[in-house]
């Protein structure tokens, strides 16, 4: 493991995998005026942070450097990241550290459930690092976490954001059997950018994963998201929409890629709010129940409100 100085994010020193540490600096253009967020300094933010730390939990909000952390934590909305803070992959866009993860904390599902109760969450989002080192990719741990939340907070709806469980036979079935309300798996980018942006993954495996969820349990909402500004073309984004609809995915998110450090993939360009609005309009015409497309859209941003909209959209279709 190599430690390099992180000169962009608020956390100045983070362990970096040699694959990232040895990359030349990649410079991005200055951020435009439409990408601005408030500093996280409210009382609600502080209270959420305290509960997270008291329960010894990791959040993707912190580890991935999410720009919406101030807004979400002020409302007591946090996305819990299970199975540690170290990922077995080194995706070029991601700020989560890479290395050999430690053993899974067997009590973590209970800690997540208790934090969900303390925060009074009506809708909780749980994600994880990639755990290619585990036989099932962490699928059973996901299932245990879902069951623990159900037991302690029966009224809380549960959304999960999973890795791809690549080459982990039977893993997906374990997670789906636990019956989350929303199953999210992000494609992250268009197929042509996978080699440089997400080299450890396979685009059509991810499409098939989402399709398989619906085949096993059609009642579960499925969701996926991509980042733009990584060098993709508009027609490629539209093709991703078609691929997701062919897999019967309900909810699409599209957000601007923001470079975590100079050792990460550069921002090729900043997509304008008008372009995001156009993507949203087109996506709805293709049949998605819910679409969120804006510069600061992230997978878990407004997840609770969006879940209510998903339910309403499905109810309208079934009339």
Swiss-Prot record:
Span list, region Disordered: 5-31
InterPro entries with a match to the protein in the record: Aldolase_TIM, Elp3/MiaA/NifB-like_rSAM, Lipoyl_synth, rSAM
Pfam families assigned to the protein according to its UniProt record, in alphabetical order: Radical_SAM
Protein name as catalogued: Lipoyl synthase
Subcellular location field: Cytoplasm
Catalysed reaction equations from the record: [[Fe-S] cluster scaffold protein carrying a second [4Fe-4S](2+) cluster] + N(6)-octanoyl-L-lysyl-[protein] + 2 oxidized [2Fe-2S]-[ferredoxin] + 2 S-adenosyl-L-methionine + 4 H(+) = [[Fe-S] cluster scaffold protein] + N(6)-[(R)-dihydrolipoyl]-L-lysyl-[protein] + 4 Fe(3+) + 2 hydrogen sulfide + 2 5'-deoxyadenosine + 2 L-methionine + 2 reduced [2Fe-2S]-[ferredoxin]
UniProt cross-references to CDD domains, sorted A to Z: Radical_SAM
The keyword Transferase is assigned to this record: yes
Requisite cofactors: [4Fe-4S] cluster
Positions bound to [4Fe-4S] cluster 2: 87, 91, 94
Cofactor: binding details: Binds 2 [4Fe-4S] clusters per subunit. One cluster is coordinated with 3 cysteines and an exchangeable S-adenosyl-L-methionine.
EC number: 2.8.1.8
Top enzyme category: transferase
Pathway: Protein modification; protein lipoylation via endogenous pathway; protein N(6)-(lipoyl)lysine from octanoyl-[acyl-carrier-protein]: step 2/2
One of the record's GO molecular function terms: 4 iron, 4 sulfur cluster binding
Chief localization: cytoplasm
Cellular component per GO, a single term: cytoplasm
Keywords carried by this UniProt record: 4Fe-4S, Cytoplasm, Iron, Iron-sulfur, Metal-binding, S-adenosyl-L-methionine, Transferase
Entry's family note: Belongs to the radical SAM superfamily. Lipoyl synthase family.
Record-annotated Radical SAM core domain positions: 73-289
Binding residues for [4Fe-4S] cluster 1: 61, 66, 72, 300
SUPFAM superfamilies assigned to the protein according to its UniProt record, in alphabetical order: Radical SAM enzymes (SSF102114)
